[in-house]
Amino acid sequence: ALDNETNEIVGESIVMTSHDDELGVAAGVIECFQNCLSENGIAPEDVVFIAHSTTQATNALIEGDVAKVGILAMGGGGISGMLAKSQSKVGDILLDSGRYIHTTHTYLKSKQVNEETVREHVQKLVDDGATVIAASEAFGVDSIEHEMLVKAEADRRGLMASVASDISKLYGLTRRTRTAAINGSILPKMMNTANCTESAVRSAGVDVPLMIMRGDGGVMDINEMKKRPVLTMLSGPAASVMGALMYLRASNGIYFEVGGTTTNIGVIKNGRPGVEYASVGGHDTYVNSLDVKVQGVAGGSMVRAGNKQILDVGPRSAHIAGLGYAVYTPPEEIEEPELEFFSPK
């Protein structure tokens, strides 16, 4: 907790990540927030602003905890239609961990778009195993009407939907479609976290807006995050960089943030962090983020072994296997350790 006028730290609280709780990591956020108020004598009515940074989007992509996305692409006919169909068929998207965001694809000519044809194509995607729908139309940034019609059909079915031209207003069908697919893949996990966190803040008696840190260092409200969670990629390191700029007043430096699942590395030069489009699995997106490199190895990383040798380290953390982190273990409990093998859940 910071004093809004002096930027002085007036309270803090640290809790373990609550992956096994029925509320997921949101339970830890709830506990940390409530502890920070009670342990530091802060009254709910004294809170004027809440900025929540989350590594949920980053961790979901690092660990492959993503949903299968059905892409309903739209565009012209003839040669231009062939090009649009090819550009919007992004295939399975490789993640840095070696896992994939699996996608399925169907194409509908823009002149044929209506409620009936959209319903048929969404059904085809569902039959192919999609649990989230991504709508993307060639030149959709000029008119979002058709993409919103797809979203309306997804809403009618109780499916989550990602609208490409609602995420980015930049041209480039392939990159815009890929961004929408990535956004859709993390929607289920992020929606649950957002709802639980918002409920917890309200139950604590705090009525001020709950703002979520974006990956570019800005903030957005909770409702925007529910539509565009992909913008929170690198939210955690963005918050740390902003903290370094504001509290430490660092003007030049190399920044490391070591968490449980990932380590983030960034540079502050002349008082400014670098900003660029985020890349997922080597593929560019239309998501502005701080120029931070994310490595899937950190304080809780598990060592992977096989064939009598160490194969790799990470990206899965010890908590995924139901284990604690060694850093929190009393030294006397790990004297003369014996080697044991565990598997992530």
Please report, for each region that a protein language model flagged, where it lies by residue:
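N-terminally biased helix-coil "hinge/interface" segments that flank
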Residues: 1-345
